[in-house]
Amino acid sequence: KQCSDFQSKWRMITYFHGEHTGVCHGIALSMCYGNQGYIDFDDITSGAHDYWTLGSPYENSKMKDMILYYQMTQCLDSGRSTYGISKNSGWGNGDLETFLKKFVAEAQYAKRVKKPFVFSFMIPEGGHSGVACGYKKDTDGNHEITIYDENSYHPGSYGGYLTMKVSSDFKSFHF
Protein backbone atom coordinates (compact mmCIF):
# COMPACT_ATOMS: atom_id res chain seq x y z
CA LYS A 1 0.00 0.00 0.00
CA GLN A 2 1.33 3.42 -0.96
CA CYS A 3 1.51 6.20 1.60
CA SER A 4 2.05 9.91 1.43
CA ASP A 5 5.10 11.75 2.73
CA PHE A 6 2.95 13.21 5.51
CA GLN A 7 1.79 9.78 6.61
CA SER A 8 5.41 8.61 6.67
CA LYS A 9 6.46 11.62 8.74
CA TRP A 10 3.55 11.08 11.12
CA ARG A 11 4.60 7.46 11.63
CA MET A 12 8.13 8.68 12.41
CA ILE A 13 6.81 11.15 14.98
CA THR A 14 4.71 8.38 16.51
CA TYR A 15 7.73 6.08 16.59
CA PHE A 16 9.97 8.63 18.33
CA HIS A 17 7.39 9.95 20.77
CA GLY A 18 5.46 6.80 21.58
CA GLU A 19 1.85 6.03 20.74
CA HIS A 20 -0.22 8.02 18.28
CA THR A 21 -1.88 10.89 20.09
CA GLY A 22 -4.51 11.97 17.58
CA VAL A 23 -4.93 14.75 15.06
CA CYS A 24 -7.19 17.23 16.86
CA HIS A 25 -4.80 20.14 16.25
CA GLY A 26 -4.68 19.39 12.52
CA ILE A 27 -8.46 19.20 12.30
CA ALA A 28 -8.97 22.41 14.29
CA LEU A 29 -6.35 24.37 12.36
CA SER A 30 -7.56 23.18 8.95
CA MET A 31 -11.13 24.10 9.96
CA CYS A 32 -10.00 27.64 10.83
CA TYR A 33 -7.92 28.04 7.67
CA GLY A 34 -10.79 26.71 5.59
CA ASN A 35 -13.22 29.13 7.23
CA GLN A 36 -10.85 31.98 6.43
CA GLY A 37 -10.55 30.99 2.75
CA TYR A 38 -6.93 29.77 2.85
CA ILE A 39 -7.91 26.25 1.76
CA ASP A 40 -9.70 25.52 -1.52
CA PHE A 41 -12.02 22.69 -0.51
CA ASP A 42 -12.66 21.83 -4.17
CA ASP A 43 -8.95 20.92 -4.52
CA ILE A 44 -9.41 18.30 -1.82
CA THR A 45 -12.83 16.94 -2.80
CA SER A 46 -14.37 17.86 -6.14
CA GLY A 47 -17.48 19.96 -5.56
CA ALA A 48 -16.82 20.56 -1.84
CA HIS A 49 -17.69 24.07 -0.68
CA ASP A 50 -17.08 23.79 3.08
CA TYR A 51 -15.39 21.54 5.63
CA TRP A 52 -18.46 19.39 6.14
CA THR A 53 -18.68 18.41 2.45
CA LEU A 54 -15.10 17.08 2.29
CA GLY A 55 -16.17 13.65 3.47
CA SER A 56 -14.27 11.37 5.81
CA PRO A 57 -10.47 11.56 6.05
CA TYR A 58 -10.50 7.76 6.27
CA GLU A 59 -11.78 7.66 2.69
CA ASN A 60 -10.00 10.75 1.32
CA SER A 61 -6.19 10.72 1.25
CA LYS A 62 -5.98 14.43 0.31
CA MET A 63 -8.04 15.37 3.36
CA LYS A 64 -5.98 13.06 5.57
CA ASP A 65 -2.76 14.63 4.26
CA MET A 66 -4.14 18.13 4.93
CA ILE A 67 -5.04 17.22 8.52
CA LEU A 68 -1.67 15.55 9.16
CA TYR A 69 0.17 18.52 7.65
CA TYR A 70 -1.55 20.97 10.00
CA GLN A 71 -1.18 18.54 12.92
CA MET A 72 2.59 18.55 12.42
CA THR A 73 2.82 22.36 12.36
CA GLN A 74 2.55 22.40 16.14
CA CYS A 75 6.05 20.89 16.19
CA LEU A 76 7.50 23.95 14.41
CA ASP A 77 8.67 27.06 16.21
CA SER A 78 6.26 29.13 14.10
CA GLY A 79 3.42 26.80 15.08
CA ARG A 80 3.79 27.25 18.81
CA SER A 81 1.37 29.11 21.05
CA THR A 82 1.12 32.87 20.86
CA TYR A 83 0.72 32.90 24.64
CA GLY A 84 0.19 30.35 27.36
CA ILE A 85 0.10 29.61 31.02
CA SER A 86 1.02 26.66 33.22
CA LYS A 87 -0.73 25.58 36.39
CA ASN A 88 2.22 23.36 37.37
CA SER A 89 3.98 26.13 39.27
CA GLY A 90 1.04 28.16 40.55
CA TRP A 91 0.21 29.33 37.00
CA GLY A 92 3.98 29.64 36.57
CA ASN A 93 4.91 31.45 33.37
CA GLY A 94 2.19 34.06 33.70
CA ASP A 95 -0.68 34.77 35.97
CA LEU A 96 -4.14 33.40 35.28
CA GLU A 97 -5.77 36.83 35.19
CA THR A 98 -3.44 38.09 32.44
CA PHE A 99 -3.95 34.91 30.43
CA LEU A 100 -7.75 35.07 30.70
CA LYS A 101 -7.79 38.75 29.70
CA LYS A 102 -5.78 37.93 26.56
CA PHE A 103 -7.97 34.93 25.78
CA VAL A 104 -11.22 36.89 26.17
CA ALA A 105 -9.82 39.75 24.07
CA GLU A 106 -8.89 37.29 21.33
CA ALA A 107 -12.37 35.72 21.45
CA GLN A 108 -13.99 39.17 21.22
CA TYR A 109 -11.79 40.08 18.25
CA ALA A 110 -12.49 36.73 16.54
CA LYS A 111 -16.22 37.33 16.87
CA ARG A 112 -15.94 40.85 15.49
CA VAL A 113 -13.93 39.82 12.40
CA LYS A 114 -15.66 36.42 12.08
CA LYS A 115 -12.39 34.45 12.26
CA PRO A 116 -12.37 31.57 14.75
CA PHE A 117 -9.04 30.47 16.21
CA VAL A 118 -7.44 27.32 17.61
CA PHE A 119 -7.48 26.85 21.38
CA SER A 120 -5.14 24.16 22.75
CA PHE A 121 -4.41 22.85 26.22
CA MET A 122 -2.03 20.34 27.74
CA ILE A 123 -2.49 18.03 30.70
CA PRO A 124 -0.07 15.40 32.03
CA GLU A 125 -1.74 12.70 29.90
CA GLY A 126 -1.53 14.69 26.65
CA GLY A 127 -3.30 17.64 25.12
CA HIS A 128 -6.16 18.67 22.92
CA SER A 129 -7.17 21.39 20.47
CA GLY A 130 -10.53 22.84 19.56
CA VAL A 131 -11.90 25.86 17.71
CA ALA A 132 -12.86 28.98 19.69
CA CYS A 133 -15.76 30.20 17.60
CA GLY A 134 -18.11 32.32 19.68
CA TYR A 135 -18.22 34.95 22.40
CA LYS A 136 -20.84 36.71 24.48
CA LYS A 137 -21.08 38.45 27.82
CA ASP A 138 -23.79 37.19 30.18
CA THR A 139 -26.07 39.39 32.30
CA ASP A 140 -23.63 39.23 35.25
CA GLY A 141 -20.69 40.46 33.14
CA ASN A 142 -19.05 37.04 32.87
CA HIS A 143 -17.54 36.03 29.54
CA GLU A 144 -18.80 32.99 27.64
CA ILE A 145 -16.53 31.57 24.94
CA THR A 146 -17.95 28.90 22.66
CA ILE A 147 -15.47 26.20 21.70
CA TYR A 148 -16.15 23.58 19.04
CA ASP A 149 -14.55 20.32 20.05
CA GLU A 150 -14.24 18.51 16.74
CA ASN A 151 -13.65 15.04 18.17
CA SER A 152 -13.58 15.51 21.94
CA TYR A 153 -10.78 14.56 24.27
CA HIS A 154 -12.47 11.46 25.67
CA PRO A 155 -12.27 8.20 23.68
CA GLY A 156 -15.49 7.36 21.83
CA SER A 157 -16.78 10.93 22.07
CA TYR A 158 -18.11 12.91 19.14
CA GLY A 159 -17.76 16.54 18.17
CA GLY A 160 -19.83 19.19 19.85
CA TYR A 161 -19.88 22.65 21.37
CA LEU A 162 -18.94 23.56 24.92
CA THR A 163 -18.85 26.85 26.75
CA MET A 164 -15.88 28.17 28.70
CA LYS A 165 -17.09 30.67 31.29
CA VAL A 166 -14.60 33.28 32.47
CA SER A 167 -15.48 35.35 35.54
CA SER A 168 -15.95 39.09 35.08
CA ASP A 169 -12.86 39.75 37.24
CA PHE A 170 -10.77 37.29 35.15
CA LYS A 171 -9.74 35.35 38.27
CA SER A 172 -11.40 32.03 37.41
CA PHE A 173 -12.97 29.95 34.65
CA HIS A 174 -14.94 26.75 34.26
CA PHE A 175 -16.61 24.63 31.59
List where the protein language model places each region.
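Active-site-adjacent substructure of cysteine-protease-like catalytic cores
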Residues: 89-148
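Cys-His-centered catalytic/binding microenvironment captured across papain-like cysteine peptidases
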Residues: 124-126, 136-175
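Histidine (H) residue identity feature
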Residues: 17-20, 25, 49, 128, ...
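Cysteine-nucleophile protease catalytic domains, especially the papain-like/related folds used
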Residues: 1-98
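Generic structural signal for short, solvent-exposed loop/turn connectors between secondary structure elements
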Residues: 12-17, 21, 34-40, 122-130, ...
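Phenylalanine-focused residue identity feature
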Residues: 6, 16, 41, 99, ...
